[in-house]
């Protein structure tokens, strides 16, 4: 999924039963809250070491998808990205795609219009999450990455161009 704000980290898990999330390890250091991701079988990663991060992502994804048969949520840009900011998609999603041989469902959204990256104040409006057609297994990494990024970015731009505002916005 696109990752523009904290909104989708709260909403997307609510939409799926027993979803696991790939998240930065630093979130597990938050007092009290930090004990929940490991207890819920999430995949915390050390973003300081690409090699260690990739190893834990692949091991965790295989466990979640093939052994536990749970959905996995990953933000392929690796971090929150402000509306209008360009950030490269990380190769980790393609490696997961190859390793687990499962369809990937891209998710476009416009949450950054109303709850910006690192913003305290929120704006009124209707956040839209759009689940796009699955990308079936079998593509090589380059073709998969191109299809994923094109799908998410194209649809997200359309959602950003036509925001649905509430009456009080």
Map each language-model feature to its residues:
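Non-catalytic C-terminal accessory region of glycerolipid acyltransferases
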Residues: 14, 54-169
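Catalytic core of membrane glycerolipid acyltransferases/transacylases, capturing the structured
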Residues: 1-50
């Amino acid at each position: 999924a696109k990752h523009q704000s904290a909104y989708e980290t709260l909403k997307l898990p609510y939409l799926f039963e027993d979803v696991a999330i790939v998240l930065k390890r630093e979130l597990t250091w938050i007092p009290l809250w930090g004990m929940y991701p490991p207890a819920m079988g999430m995949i915390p990663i050390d973003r300081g070491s690409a090699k260690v991060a990739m190893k834990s992502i692949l091991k965790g994804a295989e466990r979640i998808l093939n052994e536990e048969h749970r959905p996995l949520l990953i933000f392929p840009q690796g971090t929150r990205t402000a509306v209008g900011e360009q950030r490269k998609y990380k190769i980790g999603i393609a490696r997961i795609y190859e390793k687990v041989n499962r369809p990937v469902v891209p998710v476009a959204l416009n949450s950054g219009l109303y709850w910006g990256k690192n913003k305290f104040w929120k704006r009124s409006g209707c956040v839209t999450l759009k689940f796009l057609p699955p990308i079936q297994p079998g593509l090589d990494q380059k073709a998969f990455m191109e299809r994923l990024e094109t799908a998410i970015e194209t649809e997200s731009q359309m959602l950003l161009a036509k925001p649905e505002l509430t009456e009080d916005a």
